[in-house]
C-alpha cells in the first residue's frame, strides 16, 4: 500500500481562534498552525496540560466546531469545504467518545434508544428486528447485556456509561474516532478495562484513533505515535517508544520525569 493510501487524516496548518467580546484582534489562539497526519489503523496519542488546545483540535478536525483556517484532508478530500449534506454523509465515518459519559448521554432516553438513534438517523437497519439485533450486538461488544437496553443512564456506573458511549460511537460503523479523554472520569480500576477494549476493537474493526489524554502513562500504552501540545501548538511528535527514550521539548521531558518518579514510588 502506498504512503498516500496509508494516511487517513491529514491536517494542514489548522487554526482555531475564539474571539473575545469587545477586544480587537484574533482572540484566544486555541489551536495555532498545526499540521499532522494520522495513518489508517493507528492510534495517535495527544497529550498536554489542561487548556493547551488538544480537545479543541479534536473537535475542529471533526467539524464539531468551525476552523478559523487550514485544511482537514480525509481520504484525500478537504472535509472543511463540504456542504451540509455531504458532511452529514461523512458523519458515519467520523465519531467521538466524550470525556464525561454522564453529561454526554441523554438522561431521558433508555440505552437502547441512545444507541438506536444513530442507527435510525442513518437508516442502517432494514426493519425493527434488524435494529434490535444491531443494538444487542453493540451492547455485547462493549461488555453489556441485552437487558441493559431498557435502562436509563443514571442506573449505570461511570464505567458502564462510558461503554454505552462507545457503543453509540460504534453504531454507525465508523472509520475514525476521536477519543476525548475517555477514561479520565473513570475509576483507576476501570480505566485499563476500557483501554484494552478500545485496543481490541481497533484490531478487530480496523479503527483509527486520535486518543486525547493528560495521563501520559495511558497514552504511552495505547498509542503508536504521540503528539505533545503546549499553548495551542504541537511542540513534539514522535513514535511512542522514541518519545519515551528521547523527549526533546522541556514540557515533554518534565512530564516523563514525573511519570518515571511516580512509577519508581510504586515499587
How would you describe each model-predicted region?
Residues 52, 257-264:
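Conserved small/polar residues in nucleotide/adenosyl-binding loops
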Amino acid at each position: 500500500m502506498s504512503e498516500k493510501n496509508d494516511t487517513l487524516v491529514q491536517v494542514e496548518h489548522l487554526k482555531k481562534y475564539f474571539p473575545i467580546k469587545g477586544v480587537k484582534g484574533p482572540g484566544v489562539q486555541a489551536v495555532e498552525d498545526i499540521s499532522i497526519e494520522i495513518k489508517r489503523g493507528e492510534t495517535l496519542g495527544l497529550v498536554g496540560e489542561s487548556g493547551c488546545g488538544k480537545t479543541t483540535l479534536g473537535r475542529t478536525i471533526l467539524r464539531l466546531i468551525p476552523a478559523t483556517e487550514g485544511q482537514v484532508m480525509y481520504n484525500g478530500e478537504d472535509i472543511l469545504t463540504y456542504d451540509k449534506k455531504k458532511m452529514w454523509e461523512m458523519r458515519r465515518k467520523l465519531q467521538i467518545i466524550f470525556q464525561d459519559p454522564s453529561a454526554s448521554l441523554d438522561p431521558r432516553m433508555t440505552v437502547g434508544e441512545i444507541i438506536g438513534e444513530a442507527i435510525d438517523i442513518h437508516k442502517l437497519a432494514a426493519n425493527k428486528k434488524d435494529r434490535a439485533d444491531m443494538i444487542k450486538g453493540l451492547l455485547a461488544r462493549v461488555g453489556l447485556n441485552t437487558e441493559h437496553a431498557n435502562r436509563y443512564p443514571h442506573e449505570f456506573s461511570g464505567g458502564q456509561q462510558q461503554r454505552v458511549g462507545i457503543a453509540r460511537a460504534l453504531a454507525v460503523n465508523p472509520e475514525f474516532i476521536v477519543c476525548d479523554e475517555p477514561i479520565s472520569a473513570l475509576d483507576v480500576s476501570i480505566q485499563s478495562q476500557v483501554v484494552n477494549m478500545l485496543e481490541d476493537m481497533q484490531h478487530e474493526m480496523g479503527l483509527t484513533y486520535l486518543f486525547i489524554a493528560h495521563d501520559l502513562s495511558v497514552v504511552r500504552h495505547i498509542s503508536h505515535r504521540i503528539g505533545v501540545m503546549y499553548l495551542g501548538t504541537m511542540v513534539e511528535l514522535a513514535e511512542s517508544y522514541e518519545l519515551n527514550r528521547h523527549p526533546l521539548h522541556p514540557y515533554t521531558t518534565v512530564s516523563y520525569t514525573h511519570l518515571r518518579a511516580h512509577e519508581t514510588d510504586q515499587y
